[in-house]
Regions:
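Peripheral interaction segments used for macromolecular assembly
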Residues: 1-76
Length: 76
């Protein structure tokens, strides 16, 4: 079984989030039991399931989808 990308979710707060190809999404403002909440420029908010986090290098969180899929998680 593969180890989760993030072991301590509180450490991702205020870190940058990027899509799988490195495009910036915004910064992580909060997390709950199943999602991370990402705020981007232009006051856009995204609620992204933690299952889509593929890596965390200590300063960047990498998601497992391309920029084109980001709007699926946008809060209206």
């Amino acid at each position: 079984m593969q180890e989760p990308a993030v072991l301590q979710w509180d450490r991702v707060i205020h870190k940058s989030a990027r899509t799988e190809d490195g495009e910036p999404v915004g910064y992580i403002a909060a997390e709950d039991s199943s999602s991370i909440i990402v705020l981007s420029s232009g006051f856009r908010e995204y609620v992204i399931p933690k299952s889509h986090v593929k890596a965390f290098d200590g300063s960047q969180v990498y998601l497992d989808f391309p920029p084109g899929e980001l709007d699926r998680y946008r809060v209206q």
